[in-house]
Amino acid sequence: MRQDTTSTLSGLASFAKWQDVLAARRHADGVVAKMTFEAFEVELGQAVRGLENELKAADLARDDVDATAVIVDGQAWRKCLEQQPKTSLSASGPLTVARHLDRPADGGKCICPLALRAGIIGGVYTPVLARQVAYRMGHMTSDETSKVVTELGLSGPSSRRGDRLPKLLSAVWASHREPWEGARRQQEVVAAEAVVVAVSLDGVMVPDKEAQRSAKATREAAKKQGWSKQCSGPAGYREVGCGTVTLDDEDAKRLDTVRYGRAPEYTKQTLTAQLDAALAAILAVRPALEVGALADGAEENWRYFERPVYAKATKIVDHGHASQPLRAAMAAYYGEQSVEGRAEYARLQILLRDQPGGADDVIAALARLARQMHGKQNKRRRKLLNTELTDFQNQRERMDDADYQERGLPMGSGVVEAACKTLATQRLKRSGMSWRDGKQAMLTIRSLQQSNRWAAAWALLSAHFRIGVIEVRKYGHLRELTLAKQAA
């Protein structure tokens, strides 16, 4: 077997070049012998990649199908072109392989059986390179990805081609999302140490081209009517939804977190459906887990958590967000720079966090301060304080922080707030960025990466592009149909 392999390699031009490089390095004279180690490393790498490319090209050619006709997904295709050279991009460099093309009987676009059987993605990427480029695109721009590939000494995809790949993969994932996510969940294990499952929902504003056009039209209309003020809120931005499902042990240590990110959509329908499905899958295995529902004070988030699915869940307002109206109330009563106000804020915050029934004590303290503010000179400040008091009263049932700590429940939505930053902000809000339909592609890739589900997800994506081809061979009036196999 080793002799056969050596014989095969010796017939390759790239193998001969590799041997020449090694032989030249051992001679005292010559350019290669005088190279620095760095230069030799580059030269050797190119030679090895050349050998790798030639071996890959030979193996890829085995997936070609030379038949009068083929059947793919139930449709018949007839051979139209033979031995057409085409270059695919691999993780080691370009592979140029001659292949056959087939066309529908009634005309139309050709298919390449070789590409279908090998799982070539986007007509040009080998599966390994497609995975590598998509992974990098989750962390950097297409231009940066192209430059990194070049820096590695490879002839990789252009910036424009790299930009198209995540969109293609995202579209495929979206069309199979529910069954694929379901299949992935069935393979996952709920840790035996888990005692709490926490579901969190939030959002972050990102620059959006459609919103920017709308904002520009609004500004121009206002200008024509002589208005000088703009509408409130960040113009040219739309909200990306983020959600997390976290498993914690009895010490509130995080065991596992699944992160989801969705492009702007009405009432976050897809995102909430993903959270529902993830929670249901976990509770189907461990129905005794305590469920926590965490969010900030946004009404939209709590409309989601008030549904019957979360009837038995403990609703928790993030402690940090609960502290914000408390800080504002102290500023309204004592003044922004008051040392006494800062001290009282610190006291009440600790009371809210650690004292059983602390929320009631804080509400009582705020009500007492509101009563003490009287007179016309305090009207505006009293109104501000009463507003914050009302916020506290409205969220009272979700602010038993001492009880949550005792039961091992999280009291903050820091996990989902971090997801907003790592899923969306770090990739979608870089300087000068503005997005159209490419947002979801980045969010899908990053959510899979950050949830440690990338490898499992890629296995599903890669398999989607590998398509079986049936060869059709005629014998008189008879036809023989056989599943195409690799050539010897």
Show where each model-derived region lies.
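An N-terminal low-complexity regulatory-tail signal and nearby short nucleic-acid-interaction modules
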Residues: 58-122
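Catalytic center-proximal scaffold of phosphoryl-transfer enzymes
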Residues: 1-58, 99-488
